[in-house]
C-alpha cells in the first residue's frame, strides 16, 4: 500500500482594496467647484496597467503640491510619466483658466489598457520568440477647491 498525506484545503483570502481609506480623506463635495475642472490624458504610455495603477492609487484625492512631492519621492518607474502629466495639467490650469496651483485637487486618476506592441526575438535553430510590450492610457482630472 502506498501511504499519502491528507492535506487540509485552506482557501486563499483575497486582500481587500483600501478604497474606503482613500475616500475618507477626500475633500467634501460642497467645497469642490463642479464645473471648474481640467482634463488631461496621455495615451500609449509604455507601461503595464497594473504598474501605473499602483502609483495612481497613491495620488488620487490629494492636493497638487502634495501629489508632486509624493511622485518625486516614489521609487517606481511609473511615477515619472505620471509626474509629467500632472505638471502639464497644472500648467494648463494656470495658463488657460488662471487657477492657483495651491487650490488644485486631483479628483480622478485612472488608467486603461491600450494596444500591445508585439516584437519578435530570434532564437536558436531559426525559431522566433514573441515579445509583448503592454501600453496604457492615463487620465487625470484636476478640480479647483474653495478654501
From Swiss-Prot:
* GO biological process, any: translation
> Which cellular components does GO assign to this protein?
chloroplast; large ribosomal subunit
Q: Where in the cell is it found?
A: Plastid, Chloroplast
The record's InterPro entries line, in alphabetical order, gives: Ribosomal_uL22, Ribosomal_uL22_bac/chlpt-type, Ribosomal_uL22_bac/org-type, Ribosomal_uL22_CS, Ribosomal_uL22_sf
Q: Which PROSITE patterns match?
A: RIBOSOMAL_L22
| SUPFAM superfamilies per UniProt | Ribosomal protein L22 (SSF54843)
User: What are the protein's UniProt keywords?
Assistant: Chloroplast, Plastid, Ribonucleoprotein, Ribosomal protein, RNA-binding, rRNA-binding
Which GO MF term does the entry hold, naming one? rRNA binding
Keyword hit for RNA-binding: yes
Does the UniProt entry include the keyword Transmembrane helix? no
Question: Where is it chiefly localized?
Answer: plastid
Subunit structure, interactors included? Part of the 50S ribosomal subunit.
- Family label: Belongs to the universal ribosomal protein uL22 family.
In UniProt terms, what function does this protein have?
This protein binds specifically to 23S rRNA. The globular domain of the protein is located near the polypeptide exit tunnel on the outside of the subunit, while an extended beta-hairpin is found that lines the wall of the exit tunnel in the center of the 70S ribosome.
Q: Mind telling me what this protein is named?
A: Large ribosomal subunit protein uL22c
Q: Which organism is it from?
A: Lolium perenne
Q: Quote the gene name from the UniProt entry.
A: rpl22
Amino acid at each position: 500500500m502506498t501511504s499519502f498525506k491528507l492535506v487540509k484545503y485552506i482557501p486563499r483570502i483575497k486582500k481587500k482594496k483600501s478604497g474606503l481609506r482613500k475616500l475618507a480623506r477626500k475633500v467634501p463635495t460642497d467645497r469642490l467647484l463642479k464645473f471648474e475642472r481640467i482634463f488631461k490624458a496621455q495615451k500609449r504610455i509604455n507601461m503595464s496597467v497594473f504598474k501605473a495603477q499602483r502609483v495612481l492609487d497613491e495620488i488620487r484625492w490629494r492636493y497638487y503640491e502634495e501629489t508632486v512631492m509624493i511622485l518625486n519621492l516614489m521609487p517606481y518607474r511609473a511615477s515619472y510619466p505620471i509626474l509629467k502629466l500632472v505638471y502639464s495639467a497644472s500648467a494648463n490650469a494656470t495658463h488657460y483658466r488662471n487657477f492657483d496651483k495651491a487650490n488644485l485637487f486631483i479628483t480622478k486618476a485612472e488608467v486603461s489598457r491600450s494596444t500591445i506592441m508585439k516584437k519578435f526575438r530570434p532564437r536558436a535553430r531559426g525559431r522566433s520568440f514573441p515579445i509583448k510590450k503592454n501600453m496604457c492610457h492615463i487620465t487625470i482630472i484636476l478640480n479647483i477647491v474653495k478654501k
